[in-house]
Amino acid sequence: MMLSISDQDLSLRRRQFLKIGGLGLGGLTLSQLLAVREAAGIGQLHSDRSVIFLFLHGGPSQTETFDPKPNAPAGIRSATGDISTSIPGLRFGATFPKLASRSHLFSIVRSFQTGDGNHDIKPIVGRDSGGANLGSIYARVAGTNHPVTGMPRNVALFPRAVAPDSQPENNNFGRFTSTGALGSAYAPFVPGAGGNAQADMQLMISRQRLDDRRNLLGELDRVKQAINVEGLAGNDRLNRQAFETIVGGVANAFDLSNENQKVIESYDTAPLVRPENISRKWRNYNNYVDNAQSLGKLLLLARRLCESGCGFVTVTTNFVWDMHSDVNNAGVEEGMQYMGLPLDHALSALIDDLESRGLRDKVMVVACGEMGRTPKINARGGRDHWGGLAPLLIYGGGLKMGQVIGESNADASRPAADPMNNQNLIATVMHQLMDVGQLRTVTGLPQDVMRAVTAAEPIPGLL
């Protein structure tokens, strides 16, 4: 149900409040919001940077992406071939021509290990994050909403955020909204059909009144005092985030129709892989379609949210990188046509957009999955699970770009130098989002937060 507020009368019925996407009223008053922010934010320990974490669920191949091993024997080297990049001597898999021409703008880690070949959602949620989404750790330090715009600090984007007819998010291998021991107040805000629907953030009220945040909150406070709110505390996170999003005047950030059409077209990955060109013999067909239809627009939406004050955006499509060549999934050569081309286009569009907007130092982009793939292609033309090495791309955030960090061995099965793991990646992300040195002096923070932030050193050469 959409909340309706007229310009003439801001009084709202209790029943209307209770049905706003299943929300109640907890956490509405300015004093309560400030108290929450003070308790959660603990001063200004966080930076003004944002992170877009693109999780490539299923486990992309290190060989067909950024470590093609062109001199290795057939069956080990990239099945899609390889191409030169803007960095002399550096080669990528052949389905990444756009990223190849921009390789000087980001860094690749060729010695990254996720630790095992299991399907889960590490490193975004896993043992090394204390069972919490990395964005939830950030929100525990920075607060759940931006104090000026009201934008949720921690957002998770699934295909339905931009493509309502797509499949629901896949939680079979872990929940991207997990918060570990931090509590549900710090869970990612989920727009679209999988969470608080975009329609639930639209108010029938003039822009002038919507932007008058103090007046609107005052009216809402008076309504709250007139009704019984004792039973609404369990929905405090949803209430606070949804209403702060509404009254902060940032609901438009979630609506791509407010974006310049040429910018939308520059991100759009749908024309690259048409549904009729994807084989229906794979059980993953619908997810392949959803990925192509949504990936570019998801990254565009992530950029819009970062500009409006979001600090951490998880972006993922549904489990499309598992290229065994079995009844569920295509092999690597066919699968990279479905997956590599949209990823190449979408990441390149995001990098170009951030560069043109002067956001290179303000927004960090991370792209990786839960594992890599076997160094040897199987008899069916697929690659199987492999935890010994995985691809990792990092852009922006004030880090040193245009680098290849670490080195893999001859068949891309293990690091040959400078091994990096999930803890190093998490430390790198957290050092960009918060003042880790100052954080060490703060008492009262959950051990899971401190452990995730301080368990390892950031990836050397980036800071």
Tell where the protein language model's regions lie, with residue ranges.
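Ligand-binding pockets and gating/stacking loops
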Residues: 1-463
